[in-house]
Amino acid sequence: MSPVDRLREALPDAARDVRLNLQAVLQGGALTEGQRWGVAVASAAAARQPALLSAVLAEARSRGLDSAAEDGLAAAALMAMNNVYYRFRHMVGKPGYTEMPARLRMGRLAQPATSRADLELFSLAASAINGCEACVRTHEDVVVKGGIGEEAVHDAVRIAAVIHAAAVALEAGEVAGGHEAVSAA
């Protein structure tokens, strides 16, 4: 049984739909396997649930998708920074802030382990989880202009939504005492 399958089985009964959706979104669709698992890694990292991230990373690496996994982790880390910064600028709405340079390093965007479009796709998923409208719009535009179609973008956001739901369900199950923490081993 794969790490993600073990994790799915550990989801509480209240999250039966999440269990089924987790299986469905990680198979097929408009994304390549690398894109699918890069999005899953970025989403799991953004969702901040250690057992989930461990399982998704182990699964991606077992499939030989180390570059996608690394870019997924990089995207989540960059978006943890950028989503806070750009969400602030968007929420405040003062021109003075939007005219100031961010001065935040984002060198990984220029040198991804996969491709620029894929890293942007992973960033889009993390930004959707983090709730940064400005970042979601920007990444979606770059991704589509980079040749990734809207159906693939839709699939990526579906993965992000289900991964986030799995993180919530795992945390709720742990708090409710119904399940012990899950390991990827």
From Swiss-Prot:
It comes from the Bacteria. Transmembrane segments: none annotated. Pfam families: CMD (PF02627). HAMAP family: AhpD. One of its GO terms (biological process) is response to oxidative stress. It comes from Anaeromyxobacter sp. (strain Fw109-5). One of its GO terms (molecular function) is peroxiredoxin activity. It catalyses: N(6)-[(R)-dihydrolipoyl]-L-lysyl-[lipoyl-carrier protein] + a hydroperoxide = N(6)-[(R)-lipoyl]-L-lysyl-[lipoyl-carrier protein] + an alcohol + H2O. Its EC number is 1.11.1.28. Keywords: Antioxidant, Disulfide bond, Oxidoreductase, Peroxidase, Redox-active center. InterPro entries: AhpD, AhpD-like, AhpD_core, CMD-like. This is Alkyl hydroperoxide reductase AhpD. Disulfide bonds join 132-135. Belongs to the AhpD family. Coiled coil: none annotated. The lineage of its organism: Bacteria, Pseudomonadati, Myxococcota, Myxococcia, Myxococcales. Antioxidant protein with alkyl hydroperoxidase activity. Required for the reduction of the AhpC active site cysteine residues and for the regeneration of the AhpC enzyme activity. The active site is at residues 132, 135.
